[in-house]
Amino acid sequence: MPEAKTRSKRGSTRTNMLMSAAQVMRERGASGVTIDEVLARSGAPRGSVYYHFPEGRNQILAEALRWAGDAITESIDTAAERGALPLVRNFSEFWERTLMESDFGAGCPVVAAAIGCTNDEAQLTAIASDIFCRWRDALARAFVADNFDTAAAESLAVTCIASLEGAVVLCRSIRTTEPLRQVAREMEFLIKSREFVRRNGLPTGGH
C-alpha cells in the first residue's frame, strides 16, 4: 500500500495548496495570492509548486478559484432542492458564518477574482463568470420549481445574488453582519411579494 499512501499524500498536498490559495484570494484578492504565501499557509515544500502546478501561479489561481466555486456551488445545489427561500437563507447564513469565523477578513473569492484581477490574470474573469452563471441557474431552477415563470425566476435569481454579494462587501467594510441580515430579510419579502402577485395579480385600484 505504500504507493496508495503516496498518491493520497500528493493529493492532500495539492488540495491544501488550493485551499490556501483560495483563502488568500478571499482576504486579499487575486493579486494578493503569491507562491510564497501559498507555501507558508499550506506547509508544502517549494518543489511541490511545479510538480502539482507546472504552469505556476496562474494555474494555482485558476484552479483555486474553480475549487472554491465548486465548493460553494455544491452547497447551493443542495439547498436549492428545498426551494428558493431556503436557498437564499442558506446563502446568507453561509456568508455570515464565513465573515464571523474570519473576523471579517474573508469575503467571496469569486467576487475578488471578478473585479480584482490584472491583465495577466484575465482568465479568472471568465472562470468567475461561469461560477456566477451556475449560481444564477441553480437559484433560477429553485424559483421555477416554486412555480415562477422563467423570466421572473432568472430576474429574482440575479437580484438575490447581486444583493447578497454586495452585502458581503459592505459587511467586511463596516465589520458587522447586519447588512447581510437586512438584505436577506428584504429578499425574503420580495420573494413572498412576487409570489403573492403571481397568485393573485396586481391590485387594479379602488377599495
Describe each model-derived feature in a short phrase.
Residues M1-S12, E195-H207:
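N-terminal intrinsically disordered/low-complexity leader segments
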Residues N16, S20, V24-E63:
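Helix-turn-helix
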Residues L65-A71:
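Short, basic, alpha-helical segments at the C-terminal edge of helix-turn-helix-like DNA-binding modules
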Residues S75-A106, L156-C160:
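Hydrophobic alpha-helical connector segments
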Residues L87-N90, E101-A126:
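Amphipathic alpha-helical segments used for helix-helix packing
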Residues T98-E101, R141, I161-P179, I191-R199:
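Amphipathic C-terminal alpha-helical segment
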Residues P109-A112, A151-L170, Q182, E186-F189:
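Hydrophobic alpha-helical segments that form the core
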Residues D120-A122, F132-A157, R194-N200:
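Hydrophobic alpha-helical bundle segments that form small-molecule/ligand-binding pockets
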